[in-house]
Each structure stands twice: as structure tokens, then as C-alpha cells.
Amino acid sequence: MAELTTLARPYAKAAFEHAQAHQQLANWSAMLGLAAAVSQDDTMQRLLKAPRLTSAEKAATFIDVCGDKFNAQAQNFIHVAAENDRLLLLPEIAALFDLYKAEQEKSVDVEVTSAFALNQEQQDKLAKVLSARLGQEVRLHASEDASLIGGVVIRAGDLVIDGSVRGKIAKLAEALKS
């Protein structure tokens, strides 16, 4: 995974800098999101891995599938990625682009996993507290996992806060083993 990120980073950075310079961050985010989804299709993956096709043929087919959703610069980006055999990295490129975009917009996506469903009031309160702690606008994404037993696990970028009962039991078990 780290290797994929290393390979994808220059492409994501170049796309981000171009989009930022032309004030098209949202447009490029949408185009890269579409490209990532298309590249994950099983049929498209087989095509992209086919050794008998040239990079130009792969790029042309990829662009044809996406239709008129790509502007000329995005089509050029796909051609460059194809020439360097990086079309399969599009999901990672799109994820990094969105990370750069979120940093630029001073916002962060926060994944909150709880043992039980959080109501809207709880989500709003949690988002407000996290926004104050992180100093950024928080976009909260809530999910449930009954195996947590109780509590929540919060993931915001590299930050992980494990306030789950399962996590506390695991820490206790580790302490008892020591």
C-alpha cells in the first residue's frame, strides 16, 4: 500500500496543482473519482493489464468509457498515466487528490464507528467537538459495528481514538500478558 502511495503521489500532486491553478478542484475531484471507479471495474482491469494493447489504445478505450465527462486536460492526464503504466493507480491518485483538496479547504473526513447507531444530535455534537480539537471543518461519516461492544472508534487521517469497550479489553489483556 505504501508503495502504491509513493507511485501515485506525483500524479496526484500534479493534478492537484493544475486544478488549483485553474480553480477547478471540484471538477478534477469528480473526474478523478470517476476515473478511479472505472479503473476498478473487473473488465477494465483485465483490459488495462492486457500486454497486447499499447498505452495509447488503453488510454483511448479508458477515455471512451468515461465519455464526455473528461475535459482535454483530464484526457491528457489519462494518456500520461497510461504511457507510464499507472492507470491501475487511479484509485490511489484520486484518494490522494481528495486528501490534498481537503487540506486546502481546511476540512477533514472523520470516520466514526460505534457499537450502536448515533442519532443526528450526537453526530452534530461529536462533529463540533472534533472540529474544535482538530482546528478544521469536520465531515463526519458514521457506521455501526456491534463487535465494539460499546463506545466509539474515531479515525481522522492518521489520528485514531479508540474509545470502544473492545479496545479497552484488548489493552487490558495486553497489560495482563506483560
UniProtKB/Swiss-Prot annotation:
Note the superkingdom of the native organism: Bacteria
Statement: the UniProt record of this protein carries the keyword Ribosomal protein = no
Residues of the signal peptide: none
Q: Fetch the InterPro entries from UniProt.
A: ATP_synth_OSCP/delta_N_sf, ATPase_OSCP/dsu
- Give the record's GO CC terms: plasma membrane; proton-transporting ATP synthase complex
Q: How does it sit in the membrane?
A: Peripheral membrane protein
Q: Which UniProt keywords apply?
A: ATP synthesis, Cell inner membrane, Cell membrane, CF(1), Hydrogen ion transport, Ion transport, Membrane, Transport
Q: Which SUPFAM superfamilies match?
A: N-terminal domain of the delta subunit of the F1F0-ATP synthase
Q: Which GO terms describe its molecular function?
A: proton-transporting ATP synthase activity, rotational mechanism
Instruction: Cite the Gene3D superfamilies for this sequence.
Output: N-terminal domain of the delta subunit of the F1F0-ATP synthase (1.10.520.20)
The principal localisation class reads: membrane
Write down the Pfam families for this protein, in alphabetical order: OSCP
- Where does the protein end up? Cell inner membrane
> How would you summarize the oligomeric state and partners of this protein?
F-type ATPases have 2 components, F(1) - the catalytic core - and F(0) - the membrane proton channel. F(1) has five subunits: alpha(3), beta(3), gamma(1), delta(1), epsilon(1). F(0) has three main subunits: a(1), b(2) and c(10-14). The alpha and beta chains form an alternating ring which encloses part of the gamma chain. F(1) is attached to F(0) by a central stalk formed by the gamma and epsilon chains, while a peripheral stalk is formed by the delta and b chains.
Q: Which NCBIfam families match?
A: ATP_synt_delta, PRK05758.2-2
The UniProt similarity line reads: Belongs to the ATPase delta chain family.
**Biological function:** F(1)F(0) ATP synthase produces ATP from ADP in the presence of a proton or sodium gradient. F-type ATPases consist of two structural domains, F(1) containing the extramembraneous catalytic core and F(0) containing the membrane proton channel, linked together by a central stalk and a peripheral stalk. During catalysis, ATP synthesis in the catalytic domain of F(1) is coupled via a rotary mechanism of the central stalk subunits to proton translocation.
Q: What PANTHER family does its record include?
A: ATP SYNTHASE DELTA CHAIN
Task: Indicate what this protein is called per its UniProt record.
Answer: ATP synthase subunit delta
Q: What is the lineage of its organism?
A: Bacteria, Pseudomonadati, Pseudomonadota, Gammaproteobacteria, Pseudomonadales
